[in-house]
Amino acid sequence: MERKPSVCRKSGSWNCLLVLFLLLLFTVVSVNFLLYMYIDQMYAPSRFSHSEVNLCPYGHFKIATIKNCSPWLTCETIKKEVRKLKLVGEGAVKKVFLSEWKGLKVALSELKSLDLQDDFLHGLRMLQSMQSRYVVVLVGYCKETFSILTEYHPLGSLKDLDETFSFPKYQGFNTWQNRLKLAIEYVSIINYLHNSPHGTLIMCDSNDLDKALSQYMLTSDFHVVANDLDALPVVDKEKGILVKCGQREITGHFVAPEQLWPYGPNIEFSDDLMPSYDEKTDIWKIPAVIDHLLGHVKGSDIVRFHLFDIHSECGKANPSERPSAQMVLDTYRKVLALLMKEMAVAETREML
């Protein structure tokens, strides 16, 4: 009779341990579930992103500390109120000057040669009609002097990404997560161009990696916007309209196979004989651009492993077998969500 209380105590202890174990298991499952739900919300595709809510009506702009939308600056205003500071860039079509307007830094682009005015004005029309979260903000323009004023981005283009991340101020941002998000935004822009208000547009100013990267600016809050819209020809497959990026021979490993002269070195290049192509040239270039954007930070190799299959699809020799930009974008988003979930679960287990 004296042993019964000890048996009861033993039984009670086991019951307590079982209850504690079940509570712990329930906590782990609940935390994981909440993390999954949170990450799904954070990384699910959204119609509106970083600056979409700040877009102004057509013909207006808002930059930096300006709270309200203002009309695009006119020739008179640009002449009176915009002050050039220094030359910061120069391409085939225009020179770009860091300038100042009412204490704000802006980029002033000026035509280099009147022979290229058609390209310049085409770029202006594109900027006017395609203002969105994917495109640099148009501040003003003057057709009389062939001048375009846009928002200035001090971090430069995607070509300067590694240099930007090397500064102590930004080293904390140099993670595979942030680099993959930049990759997603780059592909989002390609997808926007392929489904633009003007139809299917091809980014022709991209015959080598540096040239392709220089078309996209890195904003101060680490987003990507298209900056140069001078060379965006339209493809319309239903009407049989394909394009050629310029009238000169294109060479190199960066461009798609269909952009190369197909008749060998023994036949002199002729634009009349060169076949046209479609937007799948942009898809071919995605893996090389993304490889640069991912860099060599810790975790980037895991990201590359998860992107291997979709990048293999992008590299198909037959353009029709390559995925659309939307398919690439969907895959990138899924990979980011998956890796973020895996990381969150691993961190939760470590805490427990």
UniProtKB/Swiss-Prot annotation:
Keywords noted in UniProt: ATP-binding, Endoplasmic reticulum, Kinase, Membrane, Nucleotide-binding, Signal-anchor, Transferase, Transmembrane, Transmembrane helix
Start and end residues of each Protein kinase domain: 82-352
InterPro entries reported in the protein's UniProt record: Kinase-like_dom_sf, POMK, Prot_kinase_dom, Ser-Thr/Tyr_kinase_cat_dom
Pfam families linked to this entry: PK_Tyr_Ser-Thr (PF07714)
Alphabetized GO MF terms: ATP binding; carbohydrate kinase activity; phosphotransferase activity, alcohol group as acceptor; protein kinase activity
GO terms classed as biological process: carbohydrate phosphorylation; protein O-linked glycosylation
Manganese found in the keyword field: no
Keyword Membrane among record annotations: yes
Top-tier EC class: transferase
GO cellular component terms given for this protein: endoplasmic reticulum membrane
Domain of life: Eukaryota
Similarity comment: family membership: Belongs to the protein kinase superfamily. Ser/Thr protein kinase family. STKL subfamily.
Function description: Protein O-mannose kinase that specifically mediates phosphorylation at the 6-position of an O-mannose of the trisaccharide (N-acetylgalactosamine (GalNAc)-beta-1,3-N-acetylglucosamine (GlcNAc)-beta-1,4-mannose) to generate phosphorylated O-mannosyl trisaccharide (N-acetylgalactosamine-beta-1,3-N-acetylglucosamine-beta-1,4-(phosphate-6-)mannose). Phosphorylated O-mannosyl trisaccharide is a carbohydrate structure present in alpha-dystroglycan (dag1), which is required for binding laminin G-like domain-containing extracellular proteins with high affinity.
Protein's name in the database: Protein O-mannose kinase
Species whose genome carries this gene: Xenopus laevis (African clawed frog)
Taxonomic lineage: Eukaryota, Metazoa, Chordata, Craniata, Vertebrata
Gene: pomk
